[in-house]
Amino acid sequence: MEYLTWGRGAKSLLFVQGGPGSFVPQGVLRGLFRREFAAYQEAGYAIWIVTRRRNMPASHTSADMADDYARLIAEEFGGRVGLVVAESFGGMIGQYLAARHPQSFGHIAMVVTAAELSAWGKDVDERMAAAVAAGDAGRAGTVLAEYLLPGPRTRWLRELLGPVVGRRVLDPSGCPAADVLTEARAELAFDARAVLPLIRPPVLLLCGGRDAFFPRTVAEETAELIPDCTLIVYERWGHLRAGSSRRVPRDVLAFVRSR
């Protein structure tokens, strides 16, 4: 597992990033992450962005990845981190972390995630994983552009902007191709409904009201299945807008203070 860390706060924040594929942020993306996490650093947290395990078995599931993070916390953080922020596919892993390893964190926030990915989201992410695994940043960028510009009418614009986006934001060499595909398979097979009632710690779930990957109805179902869940919906926002909003750290820190 590879990592990026900054800040000298006494409390540790572990960020479990989305996927398929997990990377140590570089270049433009690293700057975006630093801005996104500035509020946590100001609140006294040391930030840890940790990738998934490298060279995972092909059969590795989201539950197995949660076990990997729990093992990391046990071995490198003394058995407990102050706060876990788990986003998108990382939030899928976070659901299993909360259910199977509640002692490994003080608080957990799940951002733009839910019990199951939509059919559209599965299709897009499967194509994204194939492009990233092939080392084709341009094609991966074109698929990424579909997050913001879905539908046939904007295909020409996605194909125009995609290669530029891919080269500036994505790093196909940063994660083994086999791991990207393993994460994609785990994502496609993911359905956490059976495990959610087993979660005992309080959970903060933040979702976009117009998220095509994790529709609001599924997010609401997820919150109902978790015994102690606070759901906040950003009504007008989709997946990327909600996940990158400055409201996220504000709401997460308010949740931590309240608990």
Spans of features found by a protein language model:
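Conserved HGGG/HGGXW glycine-rich cap/lid loop of the alpha/beta-hydrolase fold
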Residues: 1-57
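Conserved acidic catalytic loop of the alpha/beta-hydrolase fold
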Residues: 64-82
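Gly/Ala-rich beta-loop-alpha elbow adjacent to hydrolase catalytic centers
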Residues: 85-90, 94
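Flexible "cap/lid" loop of the alpha/beta hydrolase fold
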Residues: 95, 99, 107-135
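Conserved alpha/beta-hydrolase catalytic His-Asp/Glu region
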Residues: 119-121, 139-186, 195
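Short beta-strand/loop motif that positions the catalytic acidic residue
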Residues: 199, 205-207, 211
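Conserved alpha/beta-hydrolase "acid-adjacent" motif
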Residues: 212-218
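Catalytic active-site module of serine/aspartate enzymes centered on a nucleophile-bearing elbow/loop
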Residues: 228-259
